[in-house]
Amino acid sequence: MQTIASTLDCYYGTNCNSLWSLEEELSRKFSAYAKNYEFPKLHRSYFHSVERYCPVICSQLTWSHDGTSICGVFDDFGIRQYLIPEDPLVDHWVPFTRWFVNGSIISSVVHPRYSLYEEDSAYQTILCSSRDLPIKLYSLRSDSINETSLYHYSTVNEENEAFETAYSMTILQDTMHFMTGSVRNRITMYDYNRHKPIWQHQWTKQSCGKSSQKAIVSCFDEYNEVHDNVRFAGTYKTEVLRIDTRSTKSELISERDSLDSWSNGIYQVIKSDNGHYLYCIKRNAREIDVIDTRMLKSRINILELPFKIGKQKFKASLNSAKGLLIGSYDGQVACWDKDCIEFGGLDPLQTAGTGIKPTNNILISDENVRVNCIATNPVDPNTLAISTSTDKFADDEGMTLKTSVKLIRMH
């Protein structure tokens, strides 16, 4: 295991103003060394003149399609882009660009053709959702100021004229449309060039039960090469929905398993490369549910986690070389190899399994840190971008919150 780049101690602590100032100082020093190129100036937060305390944890990492940069969404309302160095860095890995929105980002999605070297500016974008606001489209171009959004999309419920928060978003394969998930199991489709939705669909009480009013579409299956016109979504009621994007049709295909009495909803759905299996990662759970897309209605196996996922989520990654990867509380990454993931952990004649332990564990850090997010380089699967931190919910007043973003290469 080799560390190629790390933010080191840049985001240690919770005094945002001090951390932002340190980041700006490190960026100035780095820019001074790069004499042949003028790096963009890091933008200031809307709250730079107000004393602000919160962890600067990266909650989402997205690679560019060409593997030359990553985009990170942070808890301090910041969006940062990092360039991938040609050689390992000894000093701090500082962001290439940094800008802020003026509120908490509930969900976001980067365009699948995103790259800092992309000439078409329509691909250099990110969609962001916040409470009580429209969905906003921002530019990821290095010369963008982002004082205002490029475009916005209505989230107003016309029945009560209230904003409905988009808790999940995904861009469709044609890259011209995107979908959102919100309360009452509502799924909405938008055209990038239209302010209002194209269509909306939600489950009725009859089809979803008495608690349908509280159901939230929390995630969509993640972008890969076998989406076709069918997408899947997870909910905080531990349900899985199947969506035909050619129409307004969606259907409930999997409900909470009768043996699952402790989990608190699905927050990530990963589809195997062959498109046959869904891996549903849940809050407050000790396992990952496996669902066969050809034989729906209930889980057919589970991946046994070596720990329990609590309030703070662990974002997993499907790696074309290593299989399914998910972080842990102790600096390790649990791994189920590619053969296991492509066949749902089942032998050829099996129709259901009894649970699969990790194939192996990969040590990422000698420190006792959480590996919050893992993202695989789409060009080189042996290179990972990871977000680490100490537990932000830990009840330890004397503990310094240590967060970082790292680039590592597996052997």
Curated annotation (Swiss-Prot):
It comes from Kluyveromyces lactis (strain ATCC 8585 / CBS 2359 / DSM 70799 / NBRC 1267 / NRRL Y-1140 / WM37) (Yeast). Involved in mRNA splicing. Helps to stabilize the U1 snRNP-5' splice site interaction. The keyword Nucleus applies. InterPro entries: SWT21/TCAB1_mRNA_Telomere (IPR051150), WD40/YVTN_repeat-like_dom_sf (IPR015943), WD40_repeat_dom_sf (IPR036322). Associates with snRNPs. GO terms for biological process: mRNA processing; RNA splicing. Its main location: nucleus. It is found in: Nucleus. GO terms for cellular component: nucleus. This is Protein SWT21. The keyword RNA-binding does not apply. Keywords: mRNA processing, mRNA splicing, Nucleus. The lineage of its organism: Eukaryota, Fungi, Dikarya, Ascomycota, Saccharomycotina. Belongs to the SWT21 family.
